[in-house]
């Protein structure tokens, strides 16, 4: 745990006692701050109180005595309207921050030179974050992985020289981290997202820009207009910018030509790595993720050979285009995290012959946007509440069956793929749906898929065992 010592003996108000909020409260208390915490959920308040954290409705505290207000990233700061605690803090002139800002302050106070890589973007954050951490760990570096990827940043080991931090940052976390200053900051891309919380696309882009604007080295994907403008603007402000692209040549940076990553510097274009054959980095979207990881690792001093070795051994992100088993020429892919059509598109674009397991609790829009990938689908196996709707969309374009359950879909898809005498194929769970009609969450759905695959005869598992339980 990182004890927040920079607020020792000072009064701090905190709202939000979920996962990261609870961890933040503990880190503040351990560091000696006088914390008063609250949450709208009585169970969360009771849990904090049982751990010795002082709890009180923040409507009743003296805000003029608070040195700082810590807000959990899931609580609205600006849109659709500020949370009531935000209004109280602003009325009293109290600064509002989040857990990433507290981490930044502790690093600055105790180990300002320890390498810190921060990653943001609309898509690809988690894969890029996990890939960077894997490369660093494989190269023997003391590596701490956290942030929006699922591990609260203040639960990591304390900052010290030669300890490397890899932190995924959501727009909400950046908005609450005014002095964010990573050694290498990555902005992968920008498309409209979370506008219910940020109001406009411009405001959303402005928040994302803060991460790279404060970086020693800014690594920016320039395949969308918003990010390209940010790269130019940050560069004019004096920040060193490394551009990355999966579509176009860049003058100084890393770009992709098919599966090859090219390093451009000083007018030279040098091959850096080839992703061909790396199952966990298939697709042009992963070429961009890999380019960002390469640029970041080079920026913090990792050797080219160590980076190449890390790329080749990357196990992938769980439930995201994750190869889990192999039988002959058939690979079994767990893409359970694809809970809408846009999220399913990268996996469908990455394989040429697919036995597609799809369905669950449908999202607005269905799968109509996936029509360009229908020629890649040998057959679809439809499950859950969305089965009938998806069947209507597929029509005569794609052969399909309504399997109903995931277990039946896996068995039928595996049998059909094995009989397929054409090129290598993939049995893929990429549901384009939420899981809640049949499973607690997409993780449980993914583990169930892995379990059903493991139960097939003649399977070579590419990952550890799974329970397959719902």
From Swiss-Prot:
EC number: 6.3.2.9
Compartments, record wording: Cytoplasm
GO molecular function: ATP binding; tetrahydrofolylpolyglutamate synthase activity; UDP-N-acetylmuramoylalanine-D-glutamate ligase activity
Main location: cytoplasm
GO cellular component: cytoplasm
Entry superkingdom: Bacteria
Family, as annotated: Belongs to the MurCDEF family.
NCBIfam families: murD
Transferase listed as a keyword: no
The protein's name: UDP-N-acetylmuramoylalanine--D-glutamate ligase
SUPFAM superfamilies: MurCD N-terminal domain, MurD-like peptide ligases, catalytic domain, MurD-like peptide ligases, peptide-binding domain
UniProt binding sites for ATP: 121-127
Name of the top EC class for this enzyme: ligase
Record keywords: ATP-binding, Cell cycle, Cell division, Cell shape, Cell wall biogenesis/degradation, Cytoplasm, Ligase, Nucleotide-binding, Peptidoglycan synthesis
GO biological process: cell division; cell wall organization; peptidoglycan biosynthetic process; regulation of cell shape
UniProt cross-references to Gene3D superfamilies, sorted A to Z: Mur ligase, C-terminal domain, Mur-like, catalytic domain, NAD(P)-binding Rossmann-like Domain
